[in-house]
């Protein structure tokens, strides 16, 4: 029997800032052993990237009204509502600058409602600290074990 490689999809919106740094750190943490990791900006991602993955991570900065980025990320996420998610393991990450971290809690609740199994979440403020990177790598590892 051929063991299928585990697949992890990391999908995020970032304008080259903190969210991208965290996405890359999660990717690094997940890139161990026989794991195929794909990191994509949401503009290049498809629903298949979520469906075909064994575990996923989504990232977005906090925008107005404690919401995720609404031109690309929000419609992408909303499209997942109709899918049979079957408790797929998920990590959420984002940056909130001066805003509070309510947006990620709100997002987590929505993803639970969609059927995801939330393994963890990570928010960074103005700049990415060393401990954020360590935590992000750890979340990446978690995704491979789920």
Which ranges hold each PLM region?
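Short, Lys/Arg-enriched N-terminal segments with co-localized hydrophobic residues
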Residues: 1-4
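FMN-binding flavodoxin-like domain, especially the glycine-rich phosphate-binding loop
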Residues: 6-8, 18-21, 25-45, 49-146
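Aromatic-flanked redox-active Cys/Sec active sites in thiol-based oxidoreductases
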Residues: 12-16
């Amino acid at each position: 029997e051929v063991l299928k490689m585990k697949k992890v999809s990391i999908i995020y919106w970032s304008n080259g800032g903190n969210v991208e740094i965290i996405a890359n750190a999660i990717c690094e943490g997940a890139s161990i052993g026989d794991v195929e990791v794909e990191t994509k900006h949401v503009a290049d991602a498809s629903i298949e990237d979520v469906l075909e993955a064994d575990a996923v991570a989504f990232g977005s900065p906090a925008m107005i009204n404690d919401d995720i980025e609404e031109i690309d990320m929000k419609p992408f996420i909303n499209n997942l509502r109709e899918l049979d998610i079957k408790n797929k393991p998920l990590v959420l990450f984002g940056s909130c600058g001066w805003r509070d971290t309510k947006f990620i809690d709100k997002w987590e609740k929505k993803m639970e409602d969609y059927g995801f199994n939330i393994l963890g979440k990570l928010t960074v403020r103005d700049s990415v600290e060393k401990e954020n990177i360590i935590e992000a790598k750890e979340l990446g590892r978690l995704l491979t074990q789920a």
